[in-house]
Amino acid sequence: TFRATEALLNYIEAQYMLDHNLNAKSISYWKAIREAAGFTGEAADPQTTIAATDMAQELKGYTDGSGTQYDWGAFSAGKALTDPTLYSIRRERRTELMAEGLRWMDLIRWRSLDQLKKQPYQLEGFHLWNTPMEKWYTKDQLVDDGSVTATVSSRKLTEYFRPYQIVSTNMLYNGMTWSMAQYLQPMPLRQ
């Protein structure tokens, strides 16, 4: 399905990419999206968000057990964005369209996954080791030795559960990578 909010965000992004500034119509659309979500006053004004966006801070990322992770929307073609307005538009899309299955298409369109060519991504789940949750299971249930009988990833790697690092023979054990060919989608000869 297609939502009006998605259409408005598409317009805002396209208009900004074309003109490199937000026109009055884009600002009014953005305010309408925020007001529909319950924001009022300055919180509904996109200029407030843009003015508060520090790209140096956004690009610091956050550190987890595997190192530093970033918002993939802060990158295009393997390069970090420097434009707080464009990043704010992308962040608005991420927030407003959450769980609607559009994020993947956005990341492909922005070529945001280029950064995985240099730095593989480790998928991490819940915080398992050194938490009360660890005590919920017996030693037989939490085998983390990397053998074929292992049930969880090793505590030596990170405190978080890594589903692809349970056994060392997993083809994604060293993380998910990316190649340019993966941006292409196959087209059927007949439909």
Locations of regions flagged by a protein language model:
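Acidic/polar-rich alpha-helix caps and helix-coil junctions
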Residues: 1-191
